[in-house]
Amino acid sequence: MAIIGIGIDIVNLERINKIILCYGNKFVKKILSFNEKKKYYELKNKKKNISVNFLAKRLAAKEAASKAFGLGMKKGLYFSQFEVLNNNLGKPYFKFNNTAKNLIKALNITNIHLSLTDERKYACATVIFEDNRTNIILS
């Protein structure tokens, strides 16, 4: 496997909280997919700080993925086209739709690694895109 893109992003939780207070649902709709919004509002009804962490981690993941693509949020990419899900063990993974899904195919991306973390003030994500090529070692 060859790495074809790496993206890292860190988000300040207090900044996200201020944005939510200022823009509310408008910001949430811009960042989250339909299914992510459902989960966000469930969490928000239970405990506010958990919902802020949830939103911040999704934003960090989507920003990191856009960096791994090497495009930022261009070429018709929107955050709502990236969905962060968790498997039955809690490991996060992406589900891509529309333009993002087509870009995955066009770039021959065969493996996607996503790692999320949060700690008191920050949420962080790392994304690695790989294809099937063999790494070449130059000597």
Curated annotation (Swiss-Prot):
Catalysed reaction equations from the record: apo-[ACP] + CoA = holo-[ACP] + adenosine 3',5'-bisphosphate + H(+)
Main location: cytoplasm
InterPro entries in alphabetical order: 4-PPantetheinyl_Trfase_dom, 4-PPantetheinyl_Trfase_dom_sf, ACPS, Ppantetheine-prot_Trfase_dom
Residues binding Mg(2+), per UniProt: D9, E63
EC number: 2.7.8.7
GO molecular function terms attached to this record: holo-[acyl-carrier-protein] synthase activity; magnesium ion binding
Keyword terms of this UniProt record: Cytoplasm, Fatty acid biosynthesis, Fatty acid metabolism, Lipid biosynthesis, Lipid metabolism, Magnesium, Metal-binding, Transferase
Gene Ontology terms: biological process: fatty acid biosynthetic process
Leading EC class: transferase
Cofactor(s) for this UniProt protein: Mg(2+)
Keyword Cytoplasm tagged: yes
Localization per record: Cytoplasm
This protein's record includes keyword Cytoplasm: yes
Pfam families recorded: ACPS
Gene3D superfamilies: 4'-phosphopantetheinyl transferase domain
Function: Transfers the 4'-phosphopantetheine moiety from coenzyme A to a Ser of acyl-carrier-protein.
Family: Belongs to the P-Pant transferase superfamily. AcpS family.
Entry protein name: Holo-[acyl-carrier-protein] synthase
Designated gene of the protein: acpS
